[in-house]
A protein has these predicted regions:
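Conserved active-site-adjacent core of cysteine acyl-enzyme catalytic domains
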Residues: 30-66, 70-73, 110-111, 118, ...
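Active-site-adjacent structural segments surrounding the nucleophilic cysteine of cysteine proteases
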Residues: 2-3, 13, 20, 27-174
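Short, Lys/Arg-enriched, disordered terminal segments
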Residues: 1-15, 280
Length: 280
């Protein structure tokens, strides 16, 4: 009788554990799909809205799917217009924009932090460690793709972790490589790197030339036309090859940096490109 009682209690306990396990699984799965649904809706708004709707109209739509955006909308007077516009074109920047009032006066980071030796790190122009800092007539988060791309290459090739996007941007701007109303000059790619110990050389656009440079361990910075990466102009870094496709570090997007890209997809979007090596 004692054994039967213990067995029944054990079965009841196992049933409870199984029941709550199922509840937790369903809850977690539901939350995952809900987050996926929200992200899809936000991406659809970003992809299908027009300039005629205005920044406020787009934010109002987006606020229906994320409480953080709703908070930004309710306190929009605390945010520069360029940051609000950034949010309407890149939902990855939600937390960066949200934290602006609290962190806008923080000093920029002195280093990029931990990196892996021999690898080109992914750095983002809207990283809170430097993204709120001024660059030209805006912020690094908004128009700092050039300095951030160069910073990735410098840190990866030289392991100089103090060559942050902010430090590269400061040097570039002081030496005339920021063009007001346009952004980073292409000359930055061949001229600025030498100060930080790297050399940039313009190379021809071609599948073979890109593959050869990457196989030699030479990262490539590309100036991009409107397309998958930008609606205006942008810089990205090609860091290597995998399964016949190109690995990209996009200073404005973690998601695009996680993808592998066919050369044919990138070819028509590349406006110019530079390969980089160390000077020493």
């Amino acid at each position: 009788m004692v054994r039967k009682g213990r067995k029944k209690r054990k079965i009841r306990v196992l049933k409870r554990v199984a029941f709550w396990g199922i509840i937790v699984f369903i809850s977690c799965t539901g939350m995952y799909f809900y987050r996926e649904y929200k992200d899809i809706q936000l991406e659809n708004i970003v992809s299908h809205t027009t300039e005629n709707e205005g920044i406020e109209g787009r934010l109002q739509k987006m606020s229906n799917y994320d409480f953080r955006i709703k908070d930004i909308v309710e306190n929009k007077s605390q945010y520069p217009e360029e940051l609000l516009e950034l949010l309407t074109t890149n939902i990855e920047t939600i937390d960066f924009v949200l934290n602006y009032p609290e962190k806008k006066n923080n000093s920029p980071a002195e280093t990029v932090g931990e990196t892996r030796s021999g690898e080109i790190p992914l750095l983002l122009q809207w990283d809170e460690r430097w993204g709120y800092q001024n660059y030209g007539d805006s912020m690094l988060a908004v128009n700092g793709c050039g300095p951030t791309a160069l910073s990735m290459v410098i840190v990866g090739l030289t392991e100089n972790k103090q060559a942050t996007p902010y430090q590269v941007a400061q040097y570039a701007e002081k030496n005339g490589y920021y063009v007001e109303g346009v952004g980073s000059s292409w000359n930055m790619m061949t001229d600025v790197g030498s100060y930080f110990g790297i050399q940039g050389s313009e190379i021809p656009l071609g599948k073979d030339s890109i593959q050869t440079e990457l196989e030699l361990g030479h990262p490539i910075i590309c100036a991009m036309r409107p397309g998958d990466f930008t609606t205006t102009g942008h810089f990205i870094v090609l860091i290597g090859m995998k399964d016949g496709k190109i690995c990209v570090h996009d200073p404005n997007s973690k998601k695009r940096s996680e993808k592998l890209w066919n050369y044919e997809t990138l070819e028509s979007q590349i406006n110019n490109l530079w390969s980089f090596t160390t000077l020493f």
